[in-house]
């Protein structure tokens, strides 16, 4: 593929295209999508920091569930995203219990929001496999807008929702309906939640 640069002018588009150009030459599309899927947790963590005005202590709410999830995936001999729906239940229950304990001793709105979202995902996962990637990123897109009023940051997250959703379908990790359901629920659950709090 030949690079298309806008003359000698290095616009943001040219930087993005140049990075894409290099990635395509080094990696396959599948590998790029796998990297994007792995970056999901980083995007969620950055989102958490944005909505909490960079409250680093919230790392506690995020760190231990992630470690448990990865360890559980190893125990079950699965990839880190645990594609088997039933194997997702134990780490989700652990996260729910852990966040409940944190919420009792540390009454923080973001812990409560995280807790409710994990509960919703757990209930759905008991019966059906939903895209947690798209649920988490779309929830974060809405929460960033609700707490920061930043349309451009929310737009970045919505773009990530689209790219990640496509990647999950391309990698055959989810069906289209699972990705769409995750996206719609991520936004709607948090919209309802913030209107109730």
Curated annotation (Swiss-Prot):
Which residues span the membrane?
4-24, 32-52, 55-75, 104-124, 143-163, 177-197
Q: Which UniProt keywords apply?
A: Cell membrane, Membrane, Transmembrane, Transmembrane helix
Subcellular localization, per the record?
A: Cell membrane
Which region is the signal sequence? none
Assign the protein's first listed, main location to one coarse class. Answer: membrane
Heme is among the record's keywords: no
What do the Gene Ontology cellular component annotations say? plasma membrane
Mode of membrane association: Multi-pass membrane protein
Q: Carries keyword ATP-binding?
A: no
List, alphabetically, the Gene3D superfamilies matched.
Phosphatidic acid phosphatase type 2/haloperoxidase (1.20.144.10)
Domain of life according to the entry:
Archaea
Instruction: Report the protein name in the record.
Output: Uncharacterized protein MJ0611.1
Q: Which organism is it from?
A: Methanocaldococcus jannaschii (strain ATCC 43067 / DSM 2661 / JAL-1 / JCM 10045 / NBRC 100440)
């Amino acid at each position: 593929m030949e690079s298309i640069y806008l003359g000698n002018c290095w616009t943001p588009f040219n930087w993005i295209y140049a990075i894409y150009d290099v990635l395509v030459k080094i990696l396959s599309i599948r590998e790029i999508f796998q990297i994007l899927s792995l970056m999901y947790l980083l995007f969620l963590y950055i989102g958490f920091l944005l909505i909490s005005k960079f409250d680093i202590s919230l790392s506690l709410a995020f760190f231990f569930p992630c470690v448990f999830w990865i360890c559980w995936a190893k125990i079950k001999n699965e990839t880190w995203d645990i594609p088997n729906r039933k194997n997702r239940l134990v780490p989700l229950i652990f996260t729910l219990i852990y966040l409940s304990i944190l919420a009792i001793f540390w009454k923080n709105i973001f812990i409560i929001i995280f807790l409710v979202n994990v509960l919703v995902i757990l209930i759905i996962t008991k019966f059906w496999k939903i895209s947690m990637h798209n649920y988490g990123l779309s929830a974060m897109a809405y929460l960033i807008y609700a707490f920061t009023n930043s349309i451009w940051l929310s737009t970045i997250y919505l773009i990530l929702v689209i790219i990640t959703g496509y990647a999950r379908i391309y990698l055959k990790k989810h069906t289209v309906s699972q990705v769409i359901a995750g996206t719609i629920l991520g936004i709607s659950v948090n919209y309802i939640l913030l209107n109730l709090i």
